[in-house]
A protein has these predicted regions:
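Active-site-adjacent structural segments surrounding the nucleophilic cysteine of cysteine proteases
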Residues: 1-83, 153-155
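Conserved active-site-adjacent core of cysteine acyl-enzyme catalytic domains
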Residues: 4-6, 11, 69-188
Length: 188
C-alpha cells in the first residue's frame, strides 16, 4: 500500500513497555486464520475470533473456527449492497448469531479509545474489534482487527495489541489510526 505523506512509521522502540488486557498467548490459536479472500472479509475473521474467544474463556467450549467463519460471512459481509463493512454490519451480524444465546449483545461506538480502555480494564475482559482507517495513516488501510491489550508509550500515545487476521497475533497499532469499534457486553 502506498504510504500517505503524514503516515508515521512506528518501530518497536515506540511501543509501550507495559500492557493492560488479555495475555497474548491466548491469541496464538488464531495465527493460522488468515484472510486471503479478495476483497477481504476482515470483519468476519475478527468477529469469529471474538465469538470463539468468548466461548472458550467463559464456557470452556471449543467451537470450530471454520464453522464460525462460514456462518458469520453472510451475516456480516453480505448484509448490504455497499462494498466493505461498517461497525453496524459487524454489530448486526454478531447480534444475529448471538440472539438465541440471550446473554450477550454486540454494541458499536464511532471512537475506539474510551471503549477499548474500559473493556480491557475489566476483571475478565473480552477483546474489542477496532477499525483502522487509511485516512488516519494506518498501514492496514481500512481494516478490522481484534484488540486484546492496550498500553501507553513514553510519549503518552495509546497503542493496541491485536490479532490482525493476516497471520500476526501480536500486531501493534496506534489508537490514533483507528476509528470505530465493536464489542460484546452482557445483557442486563
Amino acid at each position: 500500500m502506498k504510504k500517505i505523506k503524514w503516515q508515521k512509521d512506528y518501530s518497536f522502540r515506540d511501543y509501550p513497555k507495559q500492557w493492560t488486557g488479555i495475555n497474548p498467548l491466548q491469541f496464538t490459536r488464531y495465527r493460522s486464520y488468515v484472510n486471503r479472500i479478495k476483497p477481504g472479509i476482515c470483519g468476519t475473521y475478527v468477529s469469529a475470533a471474538l465469538v470463539h474467544y468468548l466461548l472458550k474463556a467463559e464456557r470452556d467450549y471449543e467451537i470450530d473456527m471454520e464453522l464460525l467463519l462460514r456462518v458469520l460471512k453472510p451475516q456480516i459481509e453480505d448484509r448490504q449492497v455497499y462494498r466493505g463493512t461498517f461497525a453496524w454490519d459487524l454489530r448486526d451480524g454478531l447480534n444475529d448469531l448471538l440472539v438465541d444465546d440471550g446473554l450477550y449483545q454486540a454494541r458499536f461506538h464511532l471512537v475506539s479509545n474510551p471503549i477499548v480502555i474500559r473493556e480491557l480494564s475489566k476483571e475478565s475482559p473480552l477483546p474489542v474489534i477496532v477499525g483502522t482507517t487509511r485516512l488516519f495513516g494506518s498501514k492496514y488501510g481500512n481494516h478490522w482487527l481484534l484488540a486484546y491489550a492496550f498500553g501507553y508509550n513514553q510519549e503518552g500515545q495509546l497503542f493496541y495489541r491485536t490479532y490482525d487476521n493476516h497471520g500476526r497475533t501480536m500486531a501493534v497499532i496506534p489508537a490514533s489510526q483507528t476509528l470505530a469499534c465493536v464489542w460484546l457486553e452482557k445483557k442486563t
